[in-house]
Every structure is written in structure tokens, then in C-alpha cells.
Amino acid sequence: MVPAAGRRPPRVMRLLGWWQVLLWVLGLPVRGVEVAEESGRLWSEEQPAHPLQVGAVYLGEEELLHDPMGQDRAAEEANAVLGLDTQGDHMVMLSVIPGEAEDKVSSEPSGVTCGAGGAEDSRCNVRESLFSLDGAGAHFPDREEEYYTEPEVAESDAAPTEDSNNTESLKSPKVNCEERNITGLENFTLKILNMSQDLMDFLNPNGSDCTLVLFYTPWCRFSASLAPHFNSLPRAFPALHFLALDASQHSSLSTRFGTVAVPNILLFQGAKPMARFNHTDRTLETLKIFIFNQTGIEAKKNVVVTQADQIGPLPSTLIKSVDWLLVFSLFFLISFIMYATIRTESIRWLIPGQEQEHVE
């Protein structure tokens, strides 16, 4: 029993030794996990400054290319400019372009100049490289103002151009009209052509005098509303001729001069049509402007539409008359429908008889 008791302490010691080895082996993974977590935490803390550190390294390598002798000095100057020595400047470096970095640059002494080489030269290179983006960003608004003009300025510039074009068109008339001799003439009225009269008989093909011709119809309300204004034109322009004709009675002339709708106003020089009035607002003032722009002849002042112009010679009220062409068209259409109906009924009666004869 004594030897067994004497052997127990070495066995216990061996068990304790193996237990310590086992604990040490099992503790390695746990310690590795702790080291990994600690390294990951440190890496995450240092991650925000990573782009700036890479940029600083890049700038340091660029300086080494320019100045191989001053590697350590350039690195120190770069760290001093970037503010990597103090922990309070990390937020400044995170906003390099706007804000605090500009304040930091402005707070530095302005007496530092960029010399040709040395420590000051490397510092200037680092600063210029770091804040080149800031300088470029400051020039973007200037470029935008240079290439893009404001709408108000563009409109104000276009207005004088339009005015100049109008003045040029007014100074140089498109149609050179020979003014007629009005000596001894007191009554200036509009002449209306009847069905037997031809327009070419009133136009001089060998002359350069101008005539304003109106194509109208008495049943058109637009022609009736234009009539008083057109009746007053001979008094405003006594040097010109004014004619009016019923387009329904002179269909050949309407087709010849492209009258597809009434009222239609054409300006003739001799026997040649030169201009057409295309404005929807048909008043005395717009007609004056049209004639002046085309011929350069100014209208007489104080000429307005009077009560006599409402009466004639061109009627200003709708004339109700029978349109025989419309009556004939309706009669032909009704006759054709009746004839087609009768023929259809007779065909229906004939078809059963033909079938019966065919069976027999």
C-alpha cells in the first residue's frame, strides 16, 4: 500500500502536465479569434483614412521621382501637410475639397512661396496636387456662365435683330408700284366686277401700277365682316387701284389664282400677282400694314371706317339667295337613290322567276 501511495504523486503531476498542454492547445483557436477580431477592429478604424493614405503614398512616390535625395524629408513634409500626425485632423482630411480643408489652407502663412527645389518646393507640389480638384471645381460655374446664356439675355438680344429685320423690310419694299395720277379725282371708291366683266381687262400687263383684288362671296359672313374695312381702303391709298369680284361667278379666275377659300386678297403688279394677304385679323389697320410692307406706300392719316363704308359698295350684310348648284346636286342625289331602290326591287322579283324557269 505504501508503494501505491508513493506512486500517486508522479501520476497526478503527469495528469496536470497533460491538462496544461491540452488547455494550451485548445486556447490557440480562441486566441486566434481574439487576434482576428482585434485586427478587424483596428482595420475598420483605420479604413476611413485609407484613400488619403494611398493618395499620400502616391504623392510621396511622385516626389521621389523628382527629388531622389530628399525621400525622408519629402515624406515628413507630406505628413505635415496632410496632418497625419495629429488625430484631430482626420476629419479635415476627409473633406479635402470643400469646408475645413480650405479653412486650414487659408490659415497657413501666405508668405510661403514655391521655390525651385528643396523642402519648400516639395511642399508646394504636395499642396498643389491635393487641392487641384478644389481649384478645378471652383472653375465649373465660370464655364457654365461662359457657354450657357440666360433666356432673358437671349430674348433681349433677339429682339433688336427682329427689329432690325423689320426696319430693313420696311425700307426696301418688295413691290415697286407706280403711283397713278390722282389729279382731278375726288371720289375714291372700290369697283366691283359683274359676271360679264373680266379681271384682265382692268389690269395693265405692260404697266407697273398696283391693284389690290378681293375675291369674295355675298353669302360668306367673313366676306361681309371684311367689307367695311375694304371699302375704306381707296381713301387711305388713292394711288392704288382696288377691285372686288364674286368668286362664285368667276370660277375660272378663282381656280387660276388659287382661291380655295374666301375672302382672298391678292396684290397685283400689272397683271402679275405678287403677294397674298394671309392674316386672320382682317381690319383696316392690318390691311394698311400689309400694303405698306409690300409697296412702301404710306396710308393717309385720319382715314377710318365710316357709316358709308358699312353700306357699300361692297355689301357688309349677308345676301340670301338660292344656290341653284346646291339644288341641282340635291335633286341628282335623290333621283339616283330612287332609281337604285327601284332597280333593286325589280331584281328581287326577277330572281325567283329565273329559278323557276331553270327548274322546269
Swiss-Prot record:
GO biological process, one term: cilium assembly
Impact noted for substituting residue 248 to P: In a breast cancer sample; somatic mutation
Entry's localization field: Cell projection, Cilium membrane
Transmembrane segments: 322-342
Region (Disordered) location: 141-173
GO CC terms of this entry: ciliary membrane; cilium
CDD domains from the UniProt entry: PDI_a_ERp44_like (cd02999)
Record key words, sorted: Cell membrane, Cell projection, Ciliopathy, Cilium biogenesis/degradation, Disease variant, Glycoprotein, Meckel syndrome, Membrane, Signal, Transmembrane, Transmembrane helix
Protein name: Thioredoxin domain-containing protein 15
Taxon lineage: Eukaryota, Metazoa, Chordata, Craniata, Vertebrata
